[in-house]
Amino acid sequence: MNRKEQILEKSLLLLNERGIENVSAKIVAAELGISDGNLRYHYRTKEDIIYALYARLLEDIKQNILKLDEEEIDLKIIIHTITLVLGSLHRYKFLMIDIVGIMRKFPSIQASYQALYNPRKQKIKELIQKIMDAGVLKKETFPNQYDYFILQFYTLTDFWISESEILYRDNTRYGVSFHINLILSFIVPYLTEKGLEEFQSFTKGVK
């Protein structure tokens, strides 16, 4: 692992443990046992470190999504991909815990997030259409139903980590796997009978 990677890994650990307001570039340097100048040679500011971690999160998500283009789409693959993406979000949980504050404080991250919203939405709409055509997902019962579904889904996935940290931080029963199952259960009312059978065959449901 080179120095830049060491800085990012240590920063990720500290940011997840202490929160963005309680970690500075100097603290990261001290934890690594290197000079502040050495760290700033690689990352000039704290914002540079945070943006680099944000970029790594996006790359993780991108690679998981790209796999959907390489395989025949079915509900199992989509649920597996959702699970991987949620795992990535939790790995970089400091970004999600203070997502609004980060967007306000770091305009470059906010601009990137906003620019990605519509392409992500379009990709999900394409996936919805594919599994709808396969008879797994119900047709819309009112106009724009799945547009609302996508917005609800994004709201849930963007803020589940904050909710978990506030209410269940010290309760292992309500950990990552619980919330993944909780989010997956969100799609159940939209499934056809065929889709529900498939869902039940490879998920354990909420525990």
Question: What residue spans do the PLM features occupy?
Answer:
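Amphipathic alpha-helical packing segments from all-alpha helical-bundle domains
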Residues: 109-136, 147-162, 178-189
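Short, basic, alpha-helical segments at the C-terminal edge of helix-turn-helix-like DNA-binding modules
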Residues: 55-62
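C-terminal peripheral helix-coil segments that are non-catalytic and often amphipathic
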Residues: 162-207
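N-terminal positioning helix adjacent to the helix-turn-helix/winged-helix DNA-binding module
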Residues: 3-10, 57, 149
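Secondary-structure edge/capping motif, primarily at the C-terminal ends of alpha-helices
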Residues: 65-68, 96-103, 135, 160-168
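Hydrophobic alpha-helical connector segments
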Residues: 66-92, 150
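Amphipathic alpha-helical segments used for helix-helix packing
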Residues: 90-111
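Helix-turn-helix
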Residues: 6, 14, 18-48, 52
